[in-house]
Amino acid sequence: MKILYAASEALPFIASGGLADVAGSLPAALKKEGAECRVVMPLYGDIKPELREKMRYVTHFNVPLAWRNQYCGLFEAEANNVKYYLLDNEYYFKRSGIYGFYDDAERFVFFSKAILEMLTKIDYAPDIINCNDWQTAMVPVFLNVYYRSIEKFRGIRTVFTIHNIAYQGKYGMEIATDIAGLPDYALPIVEYDHNVNMMKGAIDQSDVVSTVSPTYCLLYTSRCV
């Protein structure tokens, strides 16, 4: 089984919280169990030079976002016997820090779309894309809206894992139209309470929804009973 693990942060490259720990350890554990697991993440400006030196340039391509096309460079590296894909756009990611910027919505909509565009450029097709938290929540949405008609994508299944439900990617509806470029029929997928909620979109469009632990799942599903 081939798994592409999509995360906004991962050790040993960069970390701000528990997601990086999971993204740095789970793929290696899955590989030991026989899965072919790879990781995709942004190429941040804060990644240490000694780690950058181990990266290899693969290719570059454009990522369509509504009316714009944005550059994306693709690099790869290996850590803990796992292949990492790092997506480069200096405008979005060459900054001090990972989160907390005024354009975080645009940055991670770009990242989500770039993951799928990357798969059109390389000789690799995962069976499963495991998305994590709101920063990759648009992957299953984009996959179903734009990419299912492409042969390479027809068999791909998605898992969406919630690590921190407090951060859901809530923004104005203009993010869905002017940034994500979703057609009118797809707007209800990400709409919640008259705003964009990217996590809601991922829950709606993913084949499987999971949480970071059974306890976390019980905590939030029990509130819905």
List each language-model region with its residue ranges.
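Catalytic cores of nucleotide-sugar-dependent glycosyltransferases that transfer UDP/GDP/TDP-activated
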Residues: 1-223
